[in-house]
Amino acid sequence: MSTDIVAQFADSALESVDSCTRITPDEFESTLSDLVIEPAVGAPLPSESVSLDGTVVDTEPSVEALGSAETGVTQAGTAIAEYGSITVESRPGGDELVSLYPPRHIVVVDASDIVPDTKAAFERFETAVRDARENDTPGASRVLATGSSATADMGELVYGVHGPKEVHIVVIES
């Protein structure tokens, strides 16, 4: 993946998230440790370069653990450099719930999953939806997010009502 597109993603993301850190796989556990507020829940990461195994993150949380978690950790399926947006995929590990319930969301992004713009992202989505339908498997659903949850439904802008109040992105560059 071009370092230019990774830099563009990081710069765009920093306009709407609390932090965006670029690291190597060897730095993952210490970076995660610095960002996590316990108790923490997570969905198993499909990444080949990093894992939540051996961390304080519970990857098989109960409903109670999910409800009391301060931090949720998921991996983005696709990241869009143009806007600093990420997608949370619907996977068996409960990525959507883990990304929405805790007030702090840590998003792991493999640099190879960063695309330049929404057109490229939707081309990836189209392929994934087609594959899911052809194979009769879940995974076609995606949540597209740019920054923390914000709403002005009742007048004043409020953060964290319909999702996380804080978002921290960790980009893994191999």
Label each region the model flagged.
Residues 1-174:
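The feature marks the mature, well-folded catalytic cores of soluble enzymes
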